[in-house]
Amino acid sequence: MATATEIRKDLRTPIVCVMGHVDHGKTSLLDRIRGTAVVDKEAGAITQHIGATEVPLQTIQTLCKGMIGGNIVVPGLLFIDTPGHHAFTNLRSRGGALADLAVLVVDINEGFQPQTVEAIKILKQFKTPFVIAANKIDRIHGWTAKNNSPFLQTFNSQPDHVKGIIETKTYELVGRMSDLGFSSDRYDRIRDFTRNIGIIPISARTGEGIPDLLMILIGLAQRFLEESLKFQVTGPGVGTILEVKEERGLGYTIDTIIYDGEIRVGDTIVIGGREKPYSTKVRALLKPKPNREIRVEERFDRVNKVTAASGVKILAPELEKAMAGSQVRVTKESNVEDIIKEIEQEMEQAKIVTDEVGVMVKADTLGSLEAIVNELREAKIPIGRADVGDISKRDIINAETVNDPMYRVMLGFNVTILPDANDYLQTTDIKIFNSDVIYHLIDDFRKWETEQRALAEKKKFAEIVRPGKVKYLPNCTFRQSKPAVIGLQIMGGMLKPGVTLIKPDGSKIGVVRQIQERNENISIATVGKEVAVSIDGPTAGRQINEGEIYFVDVPEGHSKVLEFQLKDTIKQDELETLMEFLAIKRKDNPFWGR
C-alpha cells in the first residue's frame, strides 16, 4: 500500500513511553525497532537508565512493509525507555504525563505481573492512551517463526493448536484488563480505538508483529493526537530532565526530552534544582543520531538547535544542581526571575503532604517520590517525611526523633546511603530499606513490620501477668506455712512464679515462689497440669483450704492490655479465666480495668 508523506511542520514527533514488568521485553522491543543492542550492555538484561530513541518515519515505513496507508503527517515516533516503569511519572509536562502514548509490554506466556498492574494504574491516573504488546509469541510451543513478518501473516501460517493457544492467551489478557476496568481485544478486531485497548501479539526476538505495533501507534497518533501534537516551532523550548549525569571529558550533563518549542546553543535556561530553580547558559547540545538511543554515549552529533520532540544532552555550567524530573525552560535574560517563580510554584504544588508519624522516604527524583508515595498511600503505610536525594547522616538523625519503633525506618528508592550516614548507621537502631523496585520496598517493609510486631507482641506477652485459675487439690498439703507448699491443678490460663493469688471474693492469699513438677522446678504451668507450689503468706488449713479455687491477681494495666489488645491472640481457656477474674474485680468497681 503506497503511503503519501506530507509531514506537517507544526506537529512534533509523538512521545511514546515503553513500560512493563521486569524481563517482559521492554528493551528488547526497542532494540528490535532501532537495530542496536543495548540489552547486552545492561546488567541482567534489565534497563537501568532512562533513554530516548527517535525513530524517523522512513524507518517506520521500512519496518511496516507498506502496511501504513493514507497521508502520514507525523514525523516519526520518539520512544522513551523507562527503567521499571516508575520513571514514567518523572516524564511529565505541566498538567499531565509527558508521554503522548504508551506501549505496555506483557509476556503473553506469563500474563499480568505486579508491575504490569502498577503501570496500568499510572497510565489511568495520567489518562495516557496505550496499547498492549503481548510479547514472546515465539516461545509458544510449536510456533514457527517468520522474522519481521506482520502478525496476521505469521499467525495464519501457524498450526491450528498454536492459533488456539494464542487466542486463549489473548483472552486471558482481555479478562485481566476487564478486571481493571478496561475494554480490550486483539487489535485487528477493534473498530473504535477510543473505547478499546488494542492488544498486539509480537516477538521482540524475531520481529514478528512489530510492523503491526508501529502501524497502530502511527494510526493512533494521526487520528487522536493531532491537536495535542501542535507546537510552537520557533517558540522557547520546554522540556523535562530524564537524568543528570557526569560524563568523562564533559562534566555534568542533563539528558532531556524537549516537548515544545526549540532550544539553541547560547540560550539562557531555567532548571528545577535540588534546592531551588536556577538559571544557566547552554554551552553545547548533543543530539543522538536517528535510531541511536540516548544512553549509548558514542557518536553524538553536536548541533546548534533542537526542536520538539527530541531527546538531547545539554551541557551547561552548574548542572550538578539539577534535579531529574524537573523542567528545563528557555527564556530571555529579562524573564529569568519570572520563570524561576513559576517553577518554584510548580515544585511547591508537587510537595508531599505527610502524616504526623510515619516512615521516612527518600527518592532520586520528584517523579519517583510521587510514585512511591502513591504506592505507600495505597498500601496504607503512613509517611512522616518525604524528600528527594541520597540518604545522609542528617536524615538518620531526623529518623531517630520518631518514638514509635515501627516507624524508625527509612525507605530509599533508587538512592545511595552516603558514607557519613553508613558510619552513623552502625551506632543506631534505625532500619533502612533501599531498592529500585517499589513493590520490593513495600514487600520488604511489610515483612519486617510483621516480624517486629510479632517480636513486640512476644515481649509484651512475656512482661504481662497472665490470667490463671487453680484448684487446691485434696490430700495435697505438703507443708503448712513459711512457705505453704500445696498441690494445685491448673484449671484455666497459666501459673508462673512471682504472681499473687486471690480468692473468688477478691481477698489476697500470697505470692507464688516456686512451681515443681515431678520434683523439677518449672517456670510455667499450663492448663491441665497438677503441680506442687510454694506460697509465701498463708497457712494451709487456716487462710487456705483444700478444694478451694484461686485466681492469679492480674494488675489493672495488664488486664486492659489483655482484654482490649491481646484478646484475639490468647487461648479460649485463658480468655474465659480472664473474664471470670474481671467479674470478681468489677463486682465492687464496674469500671475496673476499663
Curated annotation (Swiss-Prot):
HAMAP family: IF_2_A. GTP binds at residues 20-27, 81-85, 135-138. Residues 203-205 are annotated as: G5. It holds the Pfam family GTP_EFTU_D4. Residues 81-84 are annotated as: G3. It comes from the Archaea. Function in general translation initiation by promoting the binding of the formylmethionine-tRNA to ribosomes. Seems to function along with eIF-2. Residues 11-226 form the tr-type G domain. Belongs to the TRAFAC class translation factor GTPase superfamily. Classic translation factor GTPase family. IF-2 subfamily. InterPro entries: EFTU-type, P-loop_NTPase, Small_GTP-bd, T_Tr_GTP-bd_dom, TF_aIF-2_arc, TIF_IF2, TIF_IF2_dom3, TIF_IF2_dom3_sf. Residues 135-138 are annotated as: G4. This is Probable translation initiation factor IF-2. GO terms for molecular function: GTP binding; GTPase activity; translation initiation factor activity. Residues 20-27 are annotated as: G1. It comes from Methanocella arvoryzae (strain DSM 22066 / NBRC 105507 / MRE50). The gene is infB. Residues 45-49 are annotated as: G2. GO terms for cellular component: cytoplasm. Keywords: GTP-binding, Initiation factor, Nucleotide-binding, Protein biosynthesis.
